[in-house]
Amino acid sequence: GENMLGFMKKKKEETISYGVIGLGKFGYTLAIQLAEYGYDFLVVDKDENLVQDLRTVTESAIVVDDYDKKSIKDSGVKNCDVVIVCLEEQLEKSLLVTLNLINLGIKKVISVADTSEHGEILEKIGAEVVYPKRDMAIRLASRLRANMVLDFVQVSEEINIYKASLPKPLVGQTVVGSGLRTKFELNICLLYT
């Protein structure tokens, strides 16, 4: 049937709508953040209590009996521009839901993976993959590596962005005079005080 709440009748073409499938720690936290940012989103989970909790931040919170093809289709996610599959601890369900979403024609499917093998399969199916545990471990290790590193974001395998305090030997030097680009292949994107 048609989706249960009439979710996302596409009011404005420029509005991006999100779907979150699976309300474990990652999915639940993601949904709360989407609400805080004021985004239009739908959540889908088998746990009625978790779905009920999120009805305080979105009217579009759907309980499903299973993550099968029909339940996912009937949930309303087909009206979302981006769907994030947060079933990383349920390998088979994660793969099947991701495949079903891609077959439904969802513009962008992002799936959370726990292992590199899981992620590799998701990529072959056609999903964008995120590895929250791995990424947070990398981020923490990078922060611990140098006390001057205040924050870190890995953009790609080759590109990292660091927020760092200025080392004392560089105080008073120009960007060119610091030699950061020539010695370390570092590009300074922003300076602030």
Task: Go through each PLM region and give its residues.
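Conserved small/polar residues in nucleotide/adenosyl-binding loops
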Residues: Y192-T193
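Hydrophobic, well-ordered beta-alpha structural blocks that scaffold small-molecule cofactor pockets
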Residues: M4-G19, L23-K46
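Short alpha-helix immediately C-terminal to the canonical SAM-binding loop
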Residues: V51-Q52, G119
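A glycine-biased structural micro-motif
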Residues: V171-G177
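Helix N-cap at the beta1-alpha1 junction of Rossmann-like dinucleotide-binding domains, i.e.
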Residues: E48-N49, S116
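Internal, active-site/partner-interface "lid" segment
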Residues: F152-P167
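A charged, well-structured terminal subsegment
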Residues: I138-S156
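Phosphate-bearing ligand-interacting subdomains
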Residues: V57-L140, S165
